[in-house]
C-alpha cells in the first residue's frame, strides 16, 4: 500500500476517503468538487489528519480533525499526506 496512490485509500462514502496510519488515527481526503468525466486526481479536495489523541501534561483524551491542506487538487493532497507521514509518523 502506498499513501500516494488513491486506489490504496478506503472510500468511506462517495467523496470521502480514509487512509489509516495508526490505531485510531488516519488521513481523510474530502472531495469538494469533481466534475463528471474528469480525472479524480484533478478534483478539488481537502486533506485532514483525524484521530483520538491523548495530551500527556493535562491527562486528557480528545478527538480532533486538523486540516493539512485546503481546497487543492487530489494529487497535491496525496503528496501532502506522504510528506506529513514521512516527517511526523
Regions found by a protein language model. Give the residues of each.
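Intrinsic low-complexity, intrinsically disordered segments enriched in polar/basic residues
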Residues: 1, 21, 25, 33, ...
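A structural detector for beta-sheet-dominated domains
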Residues: 4, 30-34, 70
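Polar/charged side chains located within well-ordered beta-strands of beta-rich proteins
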Residues: 18-19, 28-30, 43-45, 81-84
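Short aromatic-glycine-(Arg/Gly/Cys) micro-motifs in beta-strand/loop hairpins
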Residues: 27-29, 35-64
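Mixed-charge, Lys/Arg-enriched low-complexity segments
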Residues: 49-89
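Negatively charged, low-complexity tracts enriched in Asp/Glu with abundant Ser/Thr
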Residues: 1-26
Amino acid at each position: 500500500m502506498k499513501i500516494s496512490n488513491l486506489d490504496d485509500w478506503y472510500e468511506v462514502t462517495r467523496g470521502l476517503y480514509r487512509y489509516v496510519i495508526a490505531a485510531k488515527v488516519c488521513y481523510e481526503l474530502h472531495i469538494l468538487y469533481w466534475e463528471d468525466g474528469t480525472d479524480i486526481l484533478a478534483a478539488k479536495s481537502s486533506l485532514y489528519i483525524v484521530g483520538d489523541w491523548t495530551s500527556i501534561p493535562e491527562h486528557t483524551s480528545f478527538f480532533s480533525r486538523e486540516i493539512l491542506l485546503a481546497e487543492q487538487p487530489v494529487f497535491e493532497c496525496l503528496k501532502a499526506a506522504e510528506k506529513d507521514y514521512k516527517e511526523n509518523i
